């Protein structure tokens, strides 16, 4: 065999070794990626199989929120008078958060005919100009429950989406605990005892999200 043939044979063997080594390294990289890949599934409620579960979180925290609201709730008559006398001072005394505080309230009232699960309440001892409404679902608006205690902060969550989902999940947890047993069609004309919260958007218009409803 000539020197040229020997050299060509050696170069060919080196190329084959390099190709084999490249193939082995590529397989190792692909295997590593596969091992490090996690499949995340979502269900209809938007919960993740891994990571933050809004509804699980809410089931755990709603009892704490409820207890905080019930402990701090002020009678509607006292609150209405305080807001009428000095709204800023009343908000600072009874509310949580700013510039639109969430205020806990307790009241007894007669349910008036409503629409879409929102019922006006006739409450004795408050100004006639005060509009009090109770939202009972099935659709519940707002993040008043999330913000009611002052202990649930944005920094507790990874991002804004989790923070928003936590608020919606608290509404669902309350609905399951408090509202599922209500016969909405039978509410008008009934007297109810309510403990709940509302965001102070307008001192003369309270939309209450309940943590407790007792029909008498």
Label every model-predicted segment.
Residues 2-216:
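OB-fold and OB-like single-stranded nucleic-acid-recognition modules
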